Curated annotation (Swiss-Prot):
Species classification: Viruses, Varidnaviria, Bamfordvirae, Nucleocytoviricota, Pokkesviricetes
Region (Disordered): 1-29
One Pfam family hit: Orthopox_F8
Family statement drawn from the similarity comment of this UniProt entry: Belongs to the orthopoxvirus OPG052 family.
Protein name: Protein OPG052
Disulfide pairings: none
Bias kind Basic and acidic residues: ranges: 11-21
Length: 65
């Protein structure tokens, strides 16, 4: 049950964050600065280090284009 609660809580702030955030893609400077954390932030709504939570980063599958 805790897992489902966690999912529900992380969904609400994600929607709020996306409303305030402009819909433009990140600039090259931002990509170089933050690198991989963009996808991680979208998935878990928090910045993570690769070495801290590597399996969770692997589990992220970006939607097919």
């Amino acid at each position: 049950m805790e897992g489902s609660k966690r999912k529900h809580e992380s969904r609400r702030p994600q929607q709020e964050q996306e409303q305030h955030r402009p819909r433009t893609p990140p600039s090259y400077e931002e990509i170089a600065k933050y690198g991989h954390s963009f996808n991680v932030k979208r998935f878990t709504n928090e910045e993570m280090c690769l070495k801290n939570d590597y399996p969770r980063i692997i589990s992220y599958n970006p939607p097919p284009k």
